[in-house]
From Swiss-Prot:
Gene3D superfamilies: Phosphorylase Kinase, domain 1, Ribonuclease Inhibitor, Transferase(Phosphotransferase) domain 1. GO terms for cellular component: membrane. SMART domains: S_TKc. Residues 1-24 form the signal peptide. The keyword Flavoprotein does not apply. It comes from the Eukaryota. The keyword Phosphoprotein applies. Residues 854-880 are annotated as: Disordered. It comes from Arabidopsis thaliana (Mouse-ear cress). This is Probable LRR receptor-like serine/threonine-protein kinase At2g28960.
Length: 880
């Protein structure tokens, strides 16, 4: 008997010890995502000593951004606010987080600016959850932001979106799964306004490990009467309010008055959800009663409510409430039969956020992610939702939109000229609504996959200029007969069914004709040698368009001279003298006909430009002729050797003179004006003198060449595009151009028109006035237009104009040029002038400068600047 009793006591004490041990363990962090943004990978993970939370580096969850450290003035107490990540590049930068679908998550973003960049300018930007805007962040009044959101897929994207000149940044990103039967999210996500645990005896936060969901409860002093207990308070509700919160509370200082609270809103139209947390923590005598009404303005959430003894309970409004005048008044009103005043432990107040946009169809998103991973694509715009919001959709694709609540579908994908290699990825077939697929001008190998024929929505497939091999699938050829537009030029090893059979038949007769072919080849070579000895570069007649399946590139329709690669080598003395280097390749000096200097631009094998841009530039320069557009002497299109031969500009480009790279005296103000007037005339001709009209798309100071008389020649037409006339106002196209000069409206919308060139020209005009870089190479990277706009508010022209001019200018002329420039860079394209208006205004500006200073233009400048502007209506414009 005694032995049994001893064994029982051992069992009881052991059970108590195990229970105590279990209770001492911190809550499970399963499902938590705790990112210290910018934390070096070699310091990850670590355990926060204050909370016991394990934080990891964010490096595996985002592809962009740079690491920073908060300055010494950063007062945050948590380790994770020491590091940060900032995003100087791109508009939208997104974290990709794997979550459980259909679960309520608490999402918390933390910001510790700490003057990390030394600029002491608080960033402003937007935060998005998936395709929807969550909050506009202003870190001058900043704090951590928190939202409760039910996930709609297994991938959650949190995006920082640049909205102005400052750079978005973030210190910490945390996700905590909640119970779905607690907070109401069916009316929309819940953006936290405040979460207060009422007590006047303590400060700081209550969070994990006291709160198993890691909610941050702010101990808040309402200057009322404190109530607290040391007894255990149970929590059986889905909210599981931490015991540290439920053990304290407040009652009104005047027991006969209500407890009053309020919620302040940013907008009168905002709606709120309020959660009141109670627990009776005072021992009531037999004749005592605590009973009160819970009121949200005029609505009674619950009448005659009595808290449960030593057990937490939560009451809330079942539908979002709209308050008057931007303030919501909350009251706990004692009932007539109550002997005790109201008591409350905590309040959580949320704004109900409208997330109107459905995410892009998840199968389309998964397909795009697979394609991105398959080819190792790293594109700054390919972040966040592919289609939504429309202004931020991914480059190179188009989507169909039914309404905001219907997931968009991807209907067009253009991956041409992306340097893609390998086979055509199977993931393309998962874009089941795709109508147009352009994979041209890449290096795809292998056969044309049969799954393309099973993509029922496809109506256009462009596979030109790849290294595809083998026969075309029969099903695909059948689809072509029924309306599918299939182009496969430039794939010499690709054949349709008939041509493949012919190739097989030819294997039997090769021995018969081999000797004959050899003789014919020898004769042909001898004839070619004789021909080339008699003439140098030859006139090329127009050739018929090459149909798909033929091995040769389509010929460029031309009446100018086509050079062989060996001739180009001879003209440049085997590429002896380098003039410069750009995105196309290296530019060499050459001599034509023994006396005429020329510039030869040779396409490099690693060039970001491809045959498409080369062809576009040749075709444009063959049909446009203007004294302020660079003249094409000839071109080389031989196998992989591509070259453009231009008239030589011995004075380099405008950028070199503005930056001082070429040495010598800086350009005078009158010379700068003359150059921009001539450049404006060239652009005006492209916009109004060409049929169809053209947009240059890459106007910048490095593309303005200067001949021996310093006459301006606009160059580099590889990105030029025609634009619509008549009723249409724009053409939709993938964004192309140079950062800093790129029209921001075109960047956002992909809608191109001639006003995009006007914006770029305005930036050029600001450059010749200030001689400042378009984007300063500082961490903040201020843009020249923003800087000039700020300086002009002071009204002092000397702070804006290039100091190297030594005030040697007519101030009225400079002011007028500044006004023209600022009108050109207006954010709205509709408010920008046309190039014709700009040209006329600048001519007046130049006349004003010359007349005020008594300067007479030389004949060379007059012949260009004073040229008449009569335009032709013919298909081919007249030379000017």
């Amino acid at each position: 008997m005694e032995g049994r009793r001893q064994r029982l006591l051992v069992f009881i004490f052991g059970a108590l010890a195990i229970t105590h041990l279990v209770q001492a363990q911190p809550p499970d962090q399963r499902g938590f995502i705790s990112l210290d943004c910018g934390l070096p990978v070699n310091e990850s993970p670590y355990t926060d000593p204050r909370t016991g939370l394990t934080f990891s580096s964010d490096a595996d969850f985002i592809l962009s951004g740079l690491r920073g450290e908060a300055g010494d003035d950063n007062t945050y107490i948590y380790r994770q606010y020491k590091d940060l990540r900032y995003f100087p590049d791109g508009i939208r930068n997104c974290y990709n987080l794997k979550v459980e679908q259909g679960i309520n998550y608490l999402i918390r973003a933390g910001f510790g600016y700490g003057n990390y960049d030394g600029l002491n300018v608080y960033p402003k930007f937007d935060l998005h959850v998936g395709p929807n805007m969550w909050i506009a962040v202003d870190l001058e009044f900043g704090k951590d932001r928190e939202i409760i959101y039910m996930t709609t897929s297994n991938l959650l994207q949190i995006c920082l979106v640049k909205t102005g000149s400052t750079i978005p940044m973030i210190s910490t990103l945390e996700l905590r799964p909640l119970r779905n039967d607690s907070y109401l999210t069916q009316f929309g996500p819940l953006d936290l306004i405040y979460r207060r645990a009422y007590s006047s005896n303590s400060t700081g936060f209550i969070r994990y490990p006291d709160d198993i969901f890691d909610r941050k409860w702010d101990r808040y002093n309402e200057f009322e009467t404190d109530v607290n207990t040391t007894l255990n308070v149970r929590s059986s509700s889905p909210f599981q309010v931490p015991e540290a919160v439920s053990r304290m509370g407040i009652t009104p200082e005047n027991a006969s008055l209500p407890l009053r609270f309020y919620v302040s809103l940013d907008d009168d139209s905002d709606k709120v959800n309020v959660y009141f947390h109670f627990a009776e923590i005072q021992a009531l005598r037999g004749n005592e009663t605590r009973e009160f009404d819970i009121e949200l303005e005029e609505d009674i959430i619950q009448s005659a409510y009595s808290p449960t003894m030593l057990q937490s309970d939560t009451k809330y409004n079942l539908s979002p409430h709209k308050c008057s005048s931007g303030l919501c008044y909350l009251k706990l009103v004692r009932t007539p039969r109550s002997t005790l005043p109201p008591l409350i432990s905590a309040i959580e107040a949320f704004k109900v956020v409208d997330f109107p946009y459905a995410e892009t169809n998840p199968n389309d998103v998964a397909a795009m992610k697979d394609i991105e991973a398959f080819y190792g694509l790293k594109m700054i715009s390919w972040q966040g939702d592919p289609c939504v919001p429309e202004l931020l959709k991914w480059e190179d694709l188009k989507c169909s939109y039914t309404n905001k609540s219907t997931p968009p579908r991807i209907i067009s994908l253009d991956l041409s000229s992306r340097g893609l290699k390998g086979v055509i990825a199977p993931a393309f077939q998962n874009l089941t609504e795709l109508r147009k697929l352009d994979l041209s001008n890449n290096s795809f190998t292998g056969g044309v996959p049969e799954f393309l024929a099973s993509m029922k929505s496809l109506s256009i497939i462009n596979l030109n200029w790849n290294d595809l091999t083998g026969p075309l699938p029969k099903l695909l050829l059948d689809r072509e007969k029924n309306g599918l537009k299939l182009t496969i030029q430039g794939n010499p090893k690709l054949c349709n069914d008939a041509s493949c059979k012919n190739n097989n038949n030819q294997t039997y007769i090769v021995p018969v004709v081999a000797s004959v072919a050899s003789v014919l080849i020898i004769i042909a070579v001898l004839i070619l040698i004789l021909v080339f000895k008699k003439r140098r570069p030859t006139q090329v007649d127009s050739l018929p368009t090459v149909q798909h399946g033929l091995p040769n590139r389509p010929s460029i329709f031309t009446q100018t001279k086509r050079f062989t690669y060996s001739e180009v080598e001879a003209l440049t003395d085997n590429f002896e003298r380098v003039l410069g280097e750009g995105g196309f390749g290296v530019v060499y000096h050459g001599i034509l006909n023994g006396t005429q200097p020329i510039a030869v631009k040779l396409l490099s094998q690693s060039s970001v430009q491809g045959y498409k841009e080369f062809k576009a530039e040749v075709e444009l320069l063959l049909r446009v002729h203007h004294v302020n557009l660079v003249s094409l002497v000839g071109y080389c299109d031989e196998e992989s050797n591509l070259a453009l031969l231009y008239e030589y500009a011995p004075n380099g480009d405008l950028k070199q003179h503005l930056s001082g790279e070429r040495g010598g005296s800086p350009l005078k103000w009158s010379s700068r004006l003359k150059i921009v007037v001539e450049t404006a005339q060239g652009l005006e001709y492209l916009h109004t003198g060409c049929k169809p009209p053209m947009v240059h798309r890459d106007v910048k100071t490095t593309n303005i060449l200067l001949d021996e008389h310093f006459q301006a020649k606009l160059a580099d037409f590889g990105l030029s595009r025609s634009f619509p006339v008549g009723g249409e106002t724009h053409v939709s196209t993938a964004v192309a151009g140079t950062p800093g000069y790129l029209d921001p409206e075109y960047y956002r919308t992909n809608r191109l028109n001639e006003k995009s060139d006007v914006y770029s020209f305005g930036i050029v005009l600001l450059e010749i006035i200030t001689s400042r870089p378009v984007i300063q190479q500082t961490r903040e990277k201020p843009h020249i237009a923003a800087w000039v706009g700020y300086m002009l508010t002071k009204g002092d022209i000397e702070n804006v104009v290039d100091p190297r001019l030594n005030r040697d200018y007519e101030p009225t002329s400079v002011w007028k040029a500044l006004e023209i420039a600022m009108s050109c860079v207006n954010p709205s394209s509709e408010k920008r002038p046309t190039m014709s208006q700009v040209t006329n205004e600048l001519k007046q500006c130049l006349t004003l400068e010359n007349s005020k200073r008594g300067v007479r233009e030389d004949m060379g400048s007059r012949s260009s600047v004073e040229m008449s502007t009569s335009f032709t209506t013919e298909i081919n414009p007249k030379a000017r």
